[in-house]
Amino acid sequence: MEYFVEDILHHRGKHQRTHIEFLVKWLNYPPDKNTWEPYSSLRDVVKLHDYLRHNNMANLINKQHR
């Protein structure tokens, strides 16, 4: 089964890729199915990039595999 991100709602943790999680609203699922996901699971998701830019965290986008 494939899941699609509808929105990124919030984040928690330090502003470092290894210590940050994002609260994900999944497409076609109710809010009680929202989950906290690590950056590593979402790093290629466009919605995450939009969220990071909007929250002045865009520096995390291009730090992959450094």
Question: Can you describe what each PLM-predicted range is?
Answer:
Residues 1-66:
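Long, charged, low-complexity intrinsically disordered regions
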